[in-house]
């Protein structure tokens, strides 16, 4: 993947401004509410019966924050995201048996949450850079499935 200077700077800027403990939980909660079939991967998280229960679930919050911090690895290794996530791809495919389509759903939810947080600063150009970055992450996480 070729990154422009603008794309690199934009991705680093976005992640430097994110409140991980807010955006991560909001992203995972949104995914679990909008795409309820994704809840099957989180059976040990307890009460996921409705949007309020999901939003208030401490395990959802913790894992959402963990996911967002996991993206730091991609931000720091933008030239080698596929290898950066090789082990994580194996874990999700072989041990956790996560449908790789769910990575895209989560990425879409993150894009929505980030757009809402950034407001008018999340211009079309910024969104294009962010979605390109997330597409590379999604592809890398799904790599083991191919």
Swiss-Prot record:
UniProt keyword Metal-binding present: yes
Gene3D superfamilies cross-referenced by the UniProt entry: Globins
Tissue specificity note: Red blood cells.
GO molecular function: haptoglobin binding; heme binding; metal ion binding; organic acid binding; oxygen binding; oxygen carrier activity; peroxidase activity
GO BP field: hydrogen peroxide catabolic process
Residues the entry annotates as binding heme b: 63, 92
Residue ranges of domain Globin in the record: 2-146
GO CC annotation terms, alphabetical: blood microparticle; haptoglobin-hemoglobin complex; hemoglobin complex
PROSITE patterns per UniProt: GLOBIN
Swiss-Prot/TrEMBL keywords: Heme, Iron, Metal-binding, Oxygen transport, Transport
Pfam families: Globin
Entry's family note: Belongs to the globin family.
Function: Involved in oxygen transport from gills to the various peripheral tissues.
Self-association and partners: HbC is a heterotetramer of two alpha chains and two beta-C chains.
Name of the molecule in the record: Hemoglobin subunit beta-C
Organism: Trematomus bernacchii
Gene: hbbc
């Amino acid at each position: 993947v070729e990154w422009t200077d603008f794309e690199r700077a934009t991705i680093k800027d976005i992640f430097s401004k994110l409140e991980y403990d807010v955006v991560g939980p909001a992203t995972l909660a949104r995914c679990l509410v909008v795409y309820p079939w994704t809840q099957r991967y989180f059976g040990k998280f307890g009460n996921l019966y409705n949007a309020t229960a999901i939003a208030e679930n401490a395990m959802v919050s913790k894992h959402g924050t963990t996911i967002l911090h996991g993206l730091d690895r991609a931000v720091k290794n933008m030239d080698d995201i596929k290898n950066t996530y090789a082990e994580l791809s194996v874990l999700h495919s072989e041990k956790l048996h996560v449908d790789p389509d769910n990575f895209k759903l989560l990425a879409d939810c993150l894009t929505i949450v980030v757009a809402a947080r950034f407001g008018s600063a999340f211009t079309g150009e910024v969104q294009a850079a962010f979605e390109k970055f997330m597409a590379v992450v999604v592809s890398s996480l799904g790599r083991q499935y191919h």
